[in-house]
Curated annotation (Swiss-Prot):
It is a multi-pass membrane protein. The lineage of its organism: Eukaryota, Metazoa, Chordata, Craniata, Vertebrata. Core subunit of respiratory chain NADH dehydrogenase (Complex I) which is composed of 45 different subunits. Keywords: Electron transport, Membrane, Mitochondrion, Mitochondrion inner membrane, NAD, Respiratory chain, Translocase, Transmembrane, Transmembrane helix, Transport, Ubiquinone. It is found in: Mitochondrion inner membrane. This is NADH-ubiquinone oxidoreductase chain 4L. Disulfide bonds: none annotated. It holds the Pfam family Oxidored_q2. GO terms for cellular component: mitochondrial inner membrane; respiratory chain complex I. GO terms for biological process: ATP synthesis coupled electron transport. Its EC number is 7.1.1.2.
Length: 98
């Protein structure tokens, strides 16, 4: 395993640890989730560039689209919660149910 792959996996592990540690605030959770998605994107791009299989080249683009969608939904929830309650705590998400 090269040092590049190890650094990317370490970035994913640190983001996962941050997600588990700072799960009470929505902003910190979204930031850690974005770090996880970016490390997965870089890993998928490296794998796609090292293998010469043509169908795998679309995988990083699909992953980037999903990352953008989860960011948009997360920020919409953050704005909704902060406008309603003034706080960014994750436990306020249960109050948004119908």
């Amino acid at each position: 395993m090269t040092l590049t792959y190890m650094n990317i996996m370490l970035a994913f592990a640190i983001s996962l640890l941050g997600m588990l540690t700072y799960r009470s605030h929505l902003v910190a959770s979204l930031l850690c989730l974005e770090g996880m998605m970016m490390s997965l994107f870089i890993m998928a791009t490296l794998i796609a560039s090292n293998t010469h299989f043509p169908l795998i080249n679309i995988m990083p683009i699909i992953l980037l689209v999903f990352a953008a969608c989860e960011t948009a939904v997360g920020l919409a929830l953050l704005i909704s919660i902060s406008n309603t309650y003034g706080l960014d705590y994750v436990h306020n998400l249960n109050l948004l149910q119908c």
